[in-house]
């Protein structure tokens, strides 16, 4: 018997109206849950059910090719519980029917979370599987307040307090609930002594209940650079098309740091935010037979996006092979250090730069170490950056002059 998936989507939210359908990262929030269920590969599409009281929700959700069940009026009020809804929904199924409840308000839950949780349920003797996350703030630091505003439960709480000595605590994050009809209706709960806690990391466990929660999730998705790279592929492809110059014989391949660089007889193909990986995908489209030289200064965005150091090594090798096959002369720069950036660390940049230095030496490629004049004590110089990653005008001017000197020096070799 195949499992079924149930996605509740009542329309009457008072705290955040229509929260289940609010557009999030280009699609209604409910689609993040529907798509995760589909992509998990654990259900037939017809066995993914949205339970709603809204004809508009129904019409939109059907666009995903799944099933929609309209709730009875008495199950559409804010007094109706999840148990009431599930008891009614499961009434026509066999007692051993396995089901998964996915709440729309956990839009960051991934397809592989669903798959892993279901595989555990199927292979172990448990009543239920429910997703849990670790509590950030220990309840030992919580208190009630007296009428006068005193923290009466906290007296002496900081004496010898060491967070690392506290036992980790976990809470159900609302993302995944798995059971079967007989067990759930008997217990009237997903929580028994035999409920297995499927642990999910904090970054996937945000629950949307208020406007502040929704804004938090928007911010999380905005700073998911892997998603942004995927969504921006068309943007970069169009960008390279706009920059295309069939007659160019010398080209600059870079990101935002090289956009302002102007070298005589060089055509600049730099784009802000682009990764080496994305540039590689597009390179065959603008690498004409006229190109004889390439100046490459790229790589930090790959680290920010989440590519491993080894993947970046591999992509540099692919770039070298492609340019070498076309008998194109190359010159590279190291990757500039950053300063106080959460998304990238200089230890990884140093690993890549050391690898680039050895690689360029072995293949007789001229290499310019831009950190010689941009860094201080192993970091990007504070006076040369606007945000720890991007350059000030002073840095851009310095880069321009050093690039020009480098090109001129290589000419004389």
UniProtKB/Swiss-Prot annotation:
Which catalysed reactions does the entry list for this protein?
an N-acylneuraminate + CTP = a CMP-N-acyl-beta-neuraminate + diphosphate
Keyword check for Methyltransferase? no
The processes (GO biological process) annotated in the record are: polysaccharide biosynthetic process
Q: Where in the cell is it found?
A: Cytoplasm
A molecular function (GO) held by this record is:
N-acylneuraminate cytidylyltransferase activity
Q: What is one cellular component GO term in this UniProt entry? A: cytoplasm
Q: What is this protein called?
A: N-acylneuraminate cytidylyltransferase
Q: Which protein family is named in the record?
A: Belongs to the CMP-NeuNAc synthase family.
- Coiled coil in keyword set: no
| Predominant location category | cytoplasm
Please explain the role this protein plays, according to its UniProt record: Catalyzes the formation of CMP-N-acetylneuraminic acid (CMP-NeuNAc), which is essential for the formation of the capsule.
| UniProt keyword list | Capsule biogenesis/degradation, Cytoplasm, Exopolysaccharide synthesis, Magnesium, Manganese, Nucleotidyltransferase, Transferase
What domain of life?
Bacteria
The EC number(s) given in the record are: 2.7.7.43
Which cofactor does this sequence's record say it needs?
Answer: Mg(2+); Mn(2+)
What Pfam families does this protein map onto? CTP_transf_3, Lipase_GDSL_2
């Amino acid at each position: 018997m195949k499992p079924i998936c149930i996605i509740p989507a009542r329309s009457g939210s008072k705290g955040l109206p229509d929260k289940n359908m609010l557009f999030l990262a280009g699609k209604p929030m409910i689609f993040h849950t529907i798509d995760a269920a589909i992509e998990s590969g654990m259900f037939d599409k017809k066995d993914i059910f949205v339970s709603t009281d809204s004809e508009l929700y129904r019409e939109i959700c059907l666009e995903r090719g799944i099933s929609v069940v309209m709730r009875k009026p008495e199950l559409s009020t804010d007094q109706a519980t999840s148990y009431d809804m599930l008891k009614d929904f499961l009434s026509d199924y066999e007692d051993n029917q396995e089901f998964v409840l996915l709440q729309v308000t956990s839009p960051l839950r991934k397809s592989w979370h669903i798959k892993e949780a279901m595989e555990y349920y199927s292979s172990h003797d448990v009543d239920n599987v429910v997703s849990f996350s670790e509590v950030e703030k220990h309840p030992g630091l919580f208190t009630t307040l007296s009428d006068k505003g005193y923290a009466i439960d906290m007296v002496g709480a900081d004496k010898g307090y060491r967070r690392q000595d506290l036992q980790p605590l976990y809470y159900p994050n609302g993302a995944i609930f798995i059971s079967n009809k007989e067990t759930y209706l008997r217990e009237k709960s997903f929580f028994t002594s035999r409920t297995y806690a499927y642990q999910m990391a904090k970054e996937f466990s945000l629950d949307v209940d208020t406007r502040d929660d929704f804004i938090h999730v928007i911010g999380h998705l905005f700073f998911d650079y892997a998603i942004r790279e995927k969504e921006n592929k068309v943007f970069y492809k169009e960008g390279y098309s706009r920059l295309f110059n069939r007659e160019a014989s010398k080209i600059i391949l870079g990101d935002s740091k090289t956009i302002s660089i102007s070298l005589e007889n060089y055509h600049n193909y730099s784009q802000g935010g682009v990764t080496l990986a994305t540039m590689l995908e597009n390179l065959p489209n603008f690498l004409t037979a006229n190109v004889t030289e390439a100046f490459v200064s790229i790589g930090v965005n790959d680290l920010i996006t989440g590519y491993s150091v080894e993947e970046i090594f591999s992509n540099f090798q692919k770039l070298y092979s492609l340019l070498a096959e076309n008998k194109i002369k190359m010159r590279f720069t190291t990757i500039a250090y950053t300063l106080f950036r959460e998304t990238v660390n200089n230890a990884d940049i140093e690993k890549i730069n050391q690898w680039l230095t050895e690689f360029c030496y072995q293949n007789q490629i001229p290499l310019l170490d831009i950190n010689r004049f941009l860094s201080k004590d192993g970091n990007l110089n504070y006076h040369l950056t606007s945000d720890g990653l991007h350059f000030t005008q002073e840095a851009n001017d310095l880069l321009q002059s050093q690039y020009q000197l480098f090109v001129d020096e290589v000419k004389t070799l």
